Regions:
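Amphipathic alpha-helical segments used for helix-helix packing
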Residues: 97-124, 170
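Outer-membrane beta-barrel domain signature
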Residues: 68, 76-80, 124-125, 130-138
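N-terminal intrinsically disordered/low-complexity leader segments
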Residues: 1-12, 196-197
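Hydrophobic alpha-helical connector segments
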Residues: 58, 62, 73-103, 153-157
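Hydrophobic/aromatic-rich alpha-helical bundle segments in the mid-to-C-terminal region
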Residues: 120, 124, 140-197
Length: 197
């Protein structure tokens, strides 16, 4: 078998393991899903899985990388469309089931990262990448912002995004007028990216 075919097969196997891990984490939680569960779901032995991923953390790193790549792709596609971002955060544009699942997993990884330095480093790398990409888009769209302001804006958007993800299920119990919420997000974004402020 050629080297290219071997790499293709390994990439396909990696992808199968990642999908199996996502399913196991969704069903059993990050702590409850074992490497044996993931291997079984992927149709592999534990030994075969360990030939592809050195640890459970390595699988989590691959999942986080996929989520970040998808989110960077969305950021690029949306081209710093803050009005759309406000509508999404307010819940006027529905979040896909896959995005909700990713959000729940990231929240669980974040909680575990307080006890696991490797997971903390994985999340910090992901956060840096998202902020760098967001900063590049912001630089293109608001070239007059200082780097300090751009960095602060990226942090605030991360806080708002993660907070909205956390609150999405909770807010159903105390309904909020989504149009009012969207208007508030737009007001924040207008002020945040005001080059004169």
């Amino acid at each position: 078998m050629s080297e290219g075919k071997v790499q293709q097969k390994q990439q396909a196997r990696r992808a199968e393991i990642v999908v199996a891990a996502q399913k196991c984490f969704a069903e059993k939680g990050l702590h409850g899903a074992s490497v044996a569960d993931i291997a079984r779901e992927a149709g592999l032995s534990v030994g075969q899985l360990y030939r592809i991923f050195a640890s459970k953390e390595a699988i989590i790193e691959a999942i986080v990388s996929e989520i970040v790549n998808a989110r960077v792709g969305e950021m690029i596609d949306e081209n710093h469309n803050l009005a759309r971002k406000a509508a999404v955060l307010a819940g006027r544009i529905p979040t896909s089931a896959a995005t909700k699942s990713d959000n729940y997993l990231l929240m669980e990884i974040n909680a575990e990262a307080s006890r696991n330095p490797r997971l903390r480093e994985i999340l910090m790398q992901a956060d840096r990448r998202l902020k760098e990409e967001g900063g590049r888009l912001s630089q293109r769209n608001q070239p007059g912002l200082s780097d300090a302001r751009r960095n602060a804006a990226s942090e605030l958007i991360a806080v708002l995004t993660e907070g909205a993800a956390y609150r999405c299920e909770l807010s159903a119990s105390t309904p909020v007028d989504k149009a009012d919420l969207e208007a508030l997000y737009n007001m924040i974004f207008d002020r945040l990216f005001d080059e004169q402020a």
